[in-house]
Structures are given as structure tokens and as C-alpha cells.
Amino acid sequence: NDNHSISLVPGDGSEDNDALLIGGQKLYFKSNPDFEAKPNYSLRIRVVDAGGISTENKFIINLIDINEAGTSLEISAQQIDENVDLNTVVGQFKTNDPDTNDQQVYTLVSGKGASSNNLILISGDKLLTNTQLNHKANDIYSVRTLAEDLVGNKIVSVFDIKINDVNDAPSGIQPSSSLQ
């Protein structure tokens, strides 16, 4: 049962020594590693036994990519003119996700901020009108949206969609044959 001292040393392969530290017989990261930022770390370690005999080796630590939830959910537009046709695109969703190739499924969900979910629908990554939206009836429609990736990570956001008032054509005007 020989005692050994272990240390990080400069030399070939020590490029990432500053990101790690040794405590006792264990190696620790100074901060949480992130596969998307840096997938592997190169370090050089020296081991010295009680008799002073030492050896040095270069090591590569390869991180495993773990799927992470999106950090925010956005929509490309939050306003639309009133009385547009059904299935008119209001906006397109985008999930900011550290996993750049992650696919998202968007759905409307109940809860706080879902008061207008029944007037809107989602097709793929697009928010569409499901009825003719009328500024005079309501000038803000609130929808609650869930983005879920293929492993089940979820993020929910509420969007307030402003309905722009459009000058409606006059109606109910009857021409008269008499002038005065």
C-alpha cells in the first residue's frame, strides 16, 4: 500500500490543466463542463510514489453529450391584422436550445396565459389563426405554448398576440335616387 502524490503538470497534453484541479486522489472540474462549448479536455498528470519515483502521462477526457432543455421559446411576430383568412400565419416559433440539431414539437397547452388557445392553432413550427380575429372584440389574444424536444425536455412560454385594427369598408349604405 504505497502512498502516491498526484499533480497536474505542464508539458505535452497539458492544454486544459487550468480547467481542472486535483483534491486527494480525485480529479475535479473547476466549473461545470459543457459538451457544446468544449467536448474534450487534454491534461497531463504526474504521479510520485513514497520513494520519489514518478511517471507522467497525457490524458484526454471525452465528455458525453447530454440532451438539454431549450433555454427560451420565441415567436417571429406578435401582431396580426384583424379579419385575416383562416390559417393565416401569425408567426414562427424558435426554441433557443444548446443542442443545435435538436428537433422541437410545438403544442398549445392549458394554464395561465392560455385564454385564446381555442382561437389559434399550431402547424409544425407556425402559429396560425383558427378563426377571424376581431380587434373590436379583443385587441390582445394570449396563447400558452409548449416546446418539447424528442427526449421530453420541455419549455413553456406565453405570447400576447396584438390584433391590429383595420379600417373596415363601410356597409349598409343604400343609394338614393333623389338628390336634395
Language-model segments: what does each one mean?
Residues 1-73, 77-88, 92-171, 176-180:
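Acidic, turn/loop-rich segments in luminal/extracellular domains of secretory-pathway
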